[in-house]
Amino acid sequence: MTSMTTRVLTGITTSGTPHLGNYVGAIRPAIQASAGADAESFYFLADLHSLIKAQDPARTQRSTLEIAATWLACGLDPDKVWFYRQSDVPETTELMWLLTCVAGKGILNRAHAYKAAVDRNRADGEDEDAGVTAGLFMYPVLMAADILIFNAHQVPVGRDQIQHIEMARDFAQRFNHVYGREFFTLPEAVIDEQVSTLPGLDGRKMSKSYGNTIPLFAPREELRKLVFSILTDSRAPGQAKDTQGSALFQLYQAFATPQESAAFAQAFADGIGWGDAKQQVFERIDQEIAPLRTRYEGLIAEPARIEAILRAGGARLRARYATPLLAELRDAVGLRDLSSQAATAAVHASEKIALPVFKQYRESDGQFYFKLNDGAGALLLQSDGFASPRDAGQVIARLKQAAQASDLQLPGVHAQVDADVVLAAMDALREA
């Protein structure tokens, strides 16, 4: 496997049974993207993350096997990408602790999943941390370690995960600053605005929470029964039917060529009967899924083969990336061979990565302005003009105490980035 310019890391949830919506929206496009020659792709089974919710050991093991078999059956090539199990790279959890020691608790308090749990408890009149594990609270640090252990440049995520990438950047910047070198690349979130979603059996988005899914590898007859159970209206054969909003048409379109979709749309206009339409949808889906199903059944019958693939991927990755980086980081923080005579001189402040900084200045209009830049010079906040430097300074003082997004909403102050990024900068200034 050759080293490439851009490292792209994708985490794979190891819980639940994959359904057609997962395949169309995530698995198929990710595998297609892995074939690109301009990226070094990392795919990992997030089995450690699953322990936050899953406490059935047998189910955890089975789910990991099923998800691994699914991705391999769908075409992921472990000879062309890095495919591994999170728990097979112990350097990840060691890095998590190193990051924990520089991570601000304030930024973790603002993590969406933790805040949502606290808000539910408050609404129910419970202690705000009732039922909240340290695993849930520390989830963003483990996710940061997943990314930073391989210095990934890009992480494809949904919009609900952007905050975690911003946190990973913050932890990386803090570590770089504290230990005086740029050990970590700052990762970027990659948002696919064209993510495909499929309707479920009831017409709503296909989702486990709605109980309306079609399992990806359902046996052929089960697949047929499920497709024929999809809700349709009462229009009879011979009556024109709308493709707009039709779950059947959307399912067909997700598996068909543009020419096939056009022909199916014409059949709708010509009044195809719902039974015939469902038969065509079933046949078109099964045409693509049947060979994948066969491969999946072969793989799931050979768990030792899957285990060997995952272990080999983890071992190669450790040797190539994780072990050398951890050795460097251990030395950086002082976890060293006690017999070593290596120099231990402190890094000069001038060599350290710069902190965020407020800059005040006067413009030609006679007004006093300020802005907040991060350590790399990127603009985070910009003010309007103030009558005096004292007025501007008072606002800066209030901003430095900001602990939540509402604290940033001051007259004459304009955030140029997400509030979480600005709040992380304030945390860094307070802890410096």
From Swiss-Prot:
Segments carrying motif 'HIGH' region: 14-22
EC number: 6.1.1.2
Catalytic activity: tRNA(Trp) + L-tryptophan + ATP = L-tryptophyl-tRNA(Trp) + AMP + diphosphate + H(+)
Binding residues annotated for ATP, in chain numbering: 13-15, 21-22, 158-160, 198, 205-209
Motif ('KMSKS' region): 205-209
SUPFAM superfamilies registered for this protein in UniProt: Nucleotidylyl transferase (SSF52374), YegP-like (SSF160113)
Family: Belongs to the class-I aminoacyl-tRNA synthetase family.
Name of this protein: Tryptophan--tRNA ligase
Organism annotation: Xanthomonas axonopodis pv. citri (strain 306)
Gene designation per UniProt: trpS
